[in-house]
């Protein structure tokens, strides 16, 4: 009888839902397991095979944990705010709410069709009022505690999307959303003071189990450095230019300074500057460039020497010129840098172009040809001369700066405060009122959620204002503090807001009194295992850890870190080995695979196709191979015999497979776990039969990968009503995982001359004797003297001969 996968899959998906077999139980006496996958953005295109791979890893772990007796929380939801939905609404006139609901329904149907064991009673939707009420609530807590603030600054602005972008959302000078060029624009911006948590974010990495490359990317993103702040005085002006450097030991080599074109000192002393026209012209050119364009290392150096501003090197008293240049940004460091052209490539190129002195202070290179960026003996450096240990030189200089009152040791971070507002409609309204008398005032907590008003036109204003700014009934309000006329904030939060705490809401998704009950958080948190894409290990992972640590400081969550473990899956490439894209026509639709082969085949294939953590191309022939695997499992019914224990011929194979599959699932080696099951299947067919005890174990081992066919066989063959409810994960006996015999190679003078099957615990003496007695080997020993005998236990015998 052929396996009717369409009927079986529909049947078991309905049965699981009716039985509530995947529902997590709060505060159970069982050990808990909280497995988390990144909730999807519900796009109109629906799910792609990348979603399937991303969710299938922890799907297998979660099903295994349930069979091991754990109380499992494996939830799903929808990160549904975002520009693509709003852009679609602008294009079609369909309200984002309606679009979002349609897309969520589509995703839900697709996820259920694949048979994922999510707890569907805990679904969250970031656009639902009961959810974003608490997103706004957390924002107000940050505002109360000084972590949410507003500042006028140059921002990355996308003229196409008409929205302000964070540095993270505009990498490479391109908009993350529409990929058009980003420009600089002066604007009031909401920030979250994530830099206040930089050290806590770094320290927390020592307490969690993240993949090494994930941990390193977070460390690099935060970018903590140690160095010194140094004050450079200005000639005839009562001001200092304060800089930060990681190499204070090179101060004697400073021959010029560079400040950002936006530095306030320029306008403050404009009357003393003799070339303001040239400076203003240069500043106008800089304003047209994105931050990415300005800070590229490989580009022509441009700048203007400021006529009227001269700095003084604090360690040798030499007067040095001050330039403006686009590669210095006000938002990074202090907006001013010291330049040591002999030992910095960018400073060297700048000095060469503008004819500035280059003074060697570290011996080791040829500064006539290039900057020397290595270590060496200090020269031309006064009290540092002769030192050849960088650490000692830096420490000595910091002591000197501190003693003279011209600087001090310090720390800087590459990570900047998080630009947190967007000029769009489809996002969480920022619950702040602007009052001419009281300033910025929080919307009272009992008035949350501050709801999005109904609008007919979602187009942003031509000046980059939010569509909300055009709705007088929303904008005009009373100040919650004084009762006077006021105006609401019209910017909305970025998509990152809702995803920064969703894992907490899963714990208690229907609570209208708090974002989650503390006792439930204490039971379920931290997340035991979080899997997601490598593209989110900096922005999302850092943002959500920041929100969580803030809530921890308020005593609202019970543990220091939200995620105990974080892993990542590799991409599924197109059949051509290139990243899937509509333009290349190499996109695989998971619905088509399910319709043609069944959900179990799709689930098995995405985990069998290669190393889970690495990219792998789609292969239709391998999909068919997984279909044969499922069919062979089904056809075991044709050779089924009675038996309540493993047969002698298959006992060792079963114990080994249980061990292998159990261990491989825990280490992301899903492909080798499936390969082990395929090998066991071959052993069974070679034996010509399988008994009921053996098939029971096999069905349980296969179930996390292919739950539908295993449930159908479990029920049909009378093992029980439902495998997911009745079964327990099998154990193995370590002693029965050891082979009684092994195959060893026999070499003569290093060349393979034969193979032997011997006892696994054979002694060296007996192994060598057996090798010499082998007929094939003896022909290579005739008339030869054996001068050396080597036995590598369990591997080989090598006989070295002469003659």
Segments (PLM) and residue ranges:
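Residue patterns forming the tRNA-binding/recognition surfaces of aminoacyl-tRNA synthetases
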Residues: 2, 11, 15-19, 91-241, ...
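NTP-handling and nucleic-acid-processing catalytic cores
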Residues: 3-13, 49, 135-358, 363, ...
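Alpha-helical recognition segments enriched in aromatics with Gly/Pro capping
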Residues: 309-315, 319-332, 361, 475-614
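Helix-rich, typically C-terminal accessory recognition domains appended to large enzymatic cores
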Residues: 79, 144-160, 250, 409-438, ...
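N-terminal catalytic cores of NTP/NDP-binding nucleotidyl/phosphoryl-transfer enzymes
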Residues: 25-94, 100, 123-138, 245-246, ...
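Secondary-structure transition/capping motifs at alpha-helix termini
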Residues: 63-71, 91-97, 113-117, 144-150, ...
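Conserved oxyanion/phosphate-binding beta-strand-loop segments in alpha/beta enzyme cores
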Residues: 1-36, 66-75, 99-106, 282-324, ...
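Glycine- and acidic
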Residues: 38-47, 119-124, 329-337, 379-383, ...
